[in-house]
């Protein structure tokens, strides 16, 4: 059945369950192909049990359709988790879209469209080369941001990106090497998980300022939130061409 564009529940790495109501991730039946297949079966008098023709596929038919390999992005905490086959592979602070300029990264359930090494992200007034490019919502994607000294905290409010999720280079590399086109990206907001860090986290994992916070490695959960008790996923029911002009850096 169709699950694309339908609400999805996620037991987050913070122990709370959220409902993600937007985004195109999920199964989607190809109406034209399915109709043609059914007509053919009827004409031939055949009776069979078969899977529908899909124009878009998801990870699972049981429980939540996104399975146990996905990127979990908490836009409130500015922190993400990448689970591969149910195990936490990497987590990190990030910087999302600039809220003050109206470029906030949208919440929703999406999928990695493709991945590309050494892309150039282009938009009005900028052309930014990145080493690891993983778009998931049009021109919005995950990528390294080696021009940033810090990540996380409240940077995104006034110093955020054009909409993309900016990552420390080492984190972007790890995700890139272990993610595939079609893998889910689940973005959400969660009240109560706002980071207390005002300066963000440096590339090496130390705090940028002497604000009231301890230095937290980029592989640790935000201070105001509880990290997962284990590394298991939460229970859930060649250089290429430049990226098109609409890409957000």
Task: Give the predicted meaning of each segment.
Residues 1-127, 132, 179-181, 186-192, ...:
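Surface-exposed, secretory/extracytoplasmic low-complexity segments enriched in Ser/Thr/Asn/Gly/Pro
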Residues 104-105, 119-219, 224-225, 231, ...:
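Exported/periplasmic cell-wall-interacting domains
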């Amino acid at each position: 059945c169709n699950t694309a564009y339908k609400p999805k529940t996620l037991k987050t790495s913070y122990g709370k369950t959220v409902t993600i109501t937007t985004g195109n991730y999920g199964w989607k039946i190809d109406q034209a192909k399915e109709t043609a297949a059914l007509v053919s079966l009827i004409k031939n008098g055949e009776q069979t049990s078969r899977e529908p023709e899909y124009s878009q596929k998801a990870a699972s038919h049981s429980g939540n359709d996104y399975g146990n390999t996905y990127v979990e992005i908490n836009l409130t905490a500015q922190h993400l988790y990448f689970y591969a086959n149910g195990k936490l592979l990497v987590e990190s602070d990030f910087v999302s879209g600039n809220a003050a300029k109206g470029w906030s990264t949208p919440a929703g359930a999406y999928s990695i469209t493709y991945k590309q090494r050494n892309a150039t992200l282009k938009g009005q007034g900028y052309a930014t080369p990145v080493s690891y490019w993983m778009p998931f919502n049009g021109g919005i994607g995950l990528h390294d941001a080696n021009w940033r000294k810090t990540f996380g905290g409240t940077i995104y409010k006034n110093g955020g990106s054009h909409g993309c999720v900016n990552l420390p280079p080492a984190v972007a590399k790890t995700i890139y090497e272990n993610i595939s086109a079609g893998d889910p990206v689940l973005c959400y907001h969660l009240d109560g998980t706002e980071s207390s860090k005002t300066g963000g986290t440096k590339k090496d994992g130390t705090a940028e300022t002497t604000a009231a916070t301890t230095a937290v490695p980029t592989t640790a959960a935000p201070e105001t939130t509880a990290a997962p008790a284990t590394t298991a996923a939460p229970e859930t029911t060649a250089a290429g061409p430049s990226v098109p002009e609409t890409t957000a850096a």
